[in-house]
Amino acid sequence: YTDAGATATDTYDGDITSSIVTQSNVDIAIVGTYTVTYDVADANGNAAITVTRTVNVVDTTVPVITLLGDNPATIEAGDTYTDAGATATDTYDGDITSSIVTQSNVDIAIVGTYTVTYDVADANGNAAITVTRTVNVVDTTLPVITLLGDNPVTLEVGDTYTDAGATATDTYDGDITSSIVTISNVDTAIAGTYTVTYDVADANGNAAI
């Protein structure tokens, strides 16, 4: 802070600016209202009415929030999501990370895109620009098909073949056995080696091997 100063004139002594006594308690490190006083007396001891200047030291700078970790973040459905958090710094208050308010609607049980928001304000009420993190909950895990019955299966020509089937489970959708597509070219009238294939995909398009 550089004070602009004052001038003083006297009808008898003329310009007595150099005789002004200035007193100031301004502390630019601390927000507050301060006073600068100006006093002067002429050569004959006549004191001027004290003049004061009010100096307001303010903090109007908004804090800055910095995300930690990935943005966007991707997590497999069903996994545990631990937010990486954020830090917040303020020119006046310093580190105000502990004051961050985090709001999250992440549901790891449901595939989708979610948002985590981070807000903070300093001691003087200056609010940071809200920072957001996008969290994508995805399902990339393949279903698993489990055969029932024997493999390989041996039949006599002319026997009736009833396929034992298979089951299918998915980490996200659960039991998807009913979605299995079975393709078979078995002809029990003709000796040979045949293949029965089982395919399934979950609701998110992940196809079993």
Walk through the language-model features, giving the residues of each.
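Solvent-exposed, low-complexity, repeat-rich "mucin-like" stalks and linkers
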Residues: 1-12, 61-92, 141-172
